[in-house]
């Protein structure tokens, strides 16, 4: 069983949603990433998403765009990201780590090279934002061959006709982008999230994680009542932008409030 499968099985057995946290790799500098990632784990994150900084992050809102600029300004490269991942894996052998980003840095040296290096670094999954599943004839197969999960995105516009294409070859979990827009936007209504999660769960055995627009414990708790995972990114990235190299403490404390919220949701479901 993979680390992702084991983690979602464990959180399911505990009756709660997994906490999936996102930070941009290399923000504020590559050297600051170790303490920040450790803080996420210490705060109760179950899965870590590490964003690959890119010059044109079209799916990201202002917070993550600024994080990309900070990371690139610090000279962060794909090699740095892989080194950060490998060091994280040594410190945290059982915590799943997912790389998330855009196609250009993933395929620049060839998808097979990227997939092999990601696997070597201990990466469990990859989310590529801008390769539609219908056009994923190279990266997805390379990831699967290397034992890395290609994690797919579904959106509010993913209808019954397109959903099979999204799920074809997907593994790890299904990431539901709950708003049709950029990261950090206002969260979608709870009723629409619940309906979407139910629809996806009826179509796949993969865990369904919900993200985009989840900014605090109350939202996380509400989504945690219905989803298998809750993804929080922009709110954490904002803390890093505010505190810089001293962000580890605030990140740990905020992550702990999110983790506690998901445990409250589990208690409410069990009551």
Swiss-Prot record:
It comes from the Bacteria. It catalyses: (1S,2R)-1-C-(indol-3-yl)glycerol 3-phosphate + L-serine = D-glyceraldehyde 3-phosphate + L-tryptophan + H2O. InterPro entries: Aldolase_TIM, RibuloseP-bd_barrel, Trp_synthase_alpha_AS, Trp_synthase_suA. Pfam families: Trp_syntA. One of its GO terms (molecular function) is tryptophan synthase activity. Coiled coil: none annotated. It is an enzyme of class 4 (lyase). The active site is at residues 49, 60. Tetramer of two alpha and two beta chains. Belongs to the TrpA family. This is Tryptophan synthase alpha chain.
